[in-house]
């Protein structure tokens, strides 16, 4: 692994050359090491199994009413431009027999956000993993994010926010269930 890190540091130095900066100037000397180290966190989702995050479930005391965790902050990196996008995710599900600790829902968002990603796929992955592991009656995930590829390059629209949703099970079949969830996350 150390050889890969050294090779990546040299790649970062090559980027400095490509953009026309001086790889030997004081401010850039340790930048390659810092960038590679930051990737340990930024891309840590590749080293985690999202199903394991939801592995501890509780069956006693499981309810059959909607469970909602909203405004889960996240940061991710766009797979198209390797620029950040960030925002909030709200998750709702209706348990059948299993519930999970709420911190696990936030960790589930984190594991998918910490990968090269597109928001549409991330939103669906969160919902699909909930359905697979918890086997609820339904799940719904809404993500809202600002994409730096839209803000600092391209069309440069600073106020743009992308909204995606993934709707599964009862949420897909029943408009009232969707409306209840949307009511919870709007407040």
Curated annotation (Swiss-Prot):
Annotated NCBIfam families: folE, PRK09347.1-2, PRK09347.1-3
Record's catalysed reaction(s): GTP + H2O = 7,8-dihydroneopterin 3'-triphosphate + formate + H(+)
GO BP annotation list: one-carbon metabolic process; tetrahydrobiopterin biosynthetic process; tetrahydrofolate biosynthetic process
Pfam families named in the record: GTP_cyclohydroI
Name under which the protein is recorded: GTP cyclohydrolase 1
Example of a GO cellular component annotation carried by this entry: cytoplasm
Pathway: Cofactor biosynthesis; 7,8-dihydroneopterin triphosphate biosynthesis; 7,8-dihydroneopterin triphosphate from GTP: step 1/1
Keyword annotations: GTP-binding, Hydrolase, Metal-binding, Nucleotide-binding, One-carbon metabolism, Zinc
Quaternary structure annotation from Swiss-Prot or TrEMBL: Toroid-shaped homodecamer, composed of two pentamers of five dimers.
Annotated source species: Wolinella succinogenes (strain ATCC 29543 / DSM 1740 / CCUG 13145 / JCM 31913 / LMG 7466 / NCTC 11488 / FDC 602W)
EC number(s) from the headed UniProt entry: 3.5.4.16
Residue numbers binding Zn(2+): 78, 81, 149
Family: Belongs to the GTP cyclohydrolase I family.
PROSITE patterns membership: GTP_CYCLOHYDROL_1_1, GTP_CYCLOHYDROL_1_2
SUPFAM superfamilies: Tetrahydrobiopterin biosynthesis enzymes-like (SSF55620)
GO molecular function, one term: zinc ion binding
């Amino acid at each position: 692994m150390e050889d890969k890190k050294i090779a990546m540091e040299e790649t970062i130095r090559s980027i400095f050359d490509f953009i026309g900066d001086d790889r030997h100037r004081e401010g850039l000397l340790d930048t390659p090491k810092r960038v590679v180290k930051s990737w340990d966190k930024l891309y840590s989702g590749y080293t985690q199994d999202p199903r394991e995050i939801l592995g501890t479930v509780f069956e006693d005391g499981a309810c059959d009413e909607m469970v909602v965790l909203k405004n889960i902050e996240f940061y991710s990196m766009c797979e198209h431009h390797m620029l950040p996008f960030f925002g909030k995710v709200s998750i709702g599900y209706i348990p059948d027999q299993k519930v999970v600790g709420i911190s696990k829902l936030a960790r589930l968002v984190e594991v998918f956000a910490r990968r090269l990603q597109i928001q549409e796929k991330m939103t669906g992955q969160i919902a699909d993993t909930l359905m697979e592991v918890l086997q609820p009656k339904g799940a719904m995930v809404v993500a809202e994010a600002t994409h730096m590829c839209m803000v600092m390059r391209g069309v440069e629209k600073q106020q743009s926010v992308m909204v995606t949703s993934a709707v599964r099970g009862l949420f897909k079949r029943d408009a009232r269930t969707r409306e209840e969830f949307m009511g919870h996350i709007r407040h």
